[in-house]
Amino acid sequence: MRSNRILLLAALLMGCAARVPEVAIGPLADGLDAFLAAHVPADENIRADPVARTETASYHVVQVRDRETPHRHAAHDLTVFVLRGRGALVLGHTRIPLRAGDAVLIPRGAAHWFVNEGRRRAVALAVFTPPLDAADAVPAGEFD
């Protein structure tokens, strides 16, 4: 009877474990761990790697060690899917806590920045619409 309770408790705890988001896009189809192992940021605070593109969007894996500086994208809407880690996105005057599995839409022109609150790099899939062809980050004041 006691062993049945232990098995039931173990099964319940496994069901409560956080699920790691999976991404089946381009080079990520073989697994995020393999991709990250091949794309380790040396001493970079932020590393962004393009992973796919369509006529209407471009897809990038972004790794953040510490934080972004406040900025805006003049010509792109941005959708961010957090794949690993946790942190806070400051969007305008609003602080949005984010962790793996969360998503957020950042409209073009909106001042924003991400602050990593974990011990390891935060990793996200960033989707730019229209596709990102050139640098589009324009510095923005903290409460711009």
Regions found by a protein language model. Give the residues of each.
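Bacterial N-terminal signal peptides
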Residues: 7-15
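Conserved short histidine dyad/triad with adjacent acidic residue
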Residues: 58-74
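Structural motif
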Residues: 58, 86-88, 95, 111, ...
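Short acidic-glycine-tyrosine-enriched beta hairpin
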Residues: 94-108
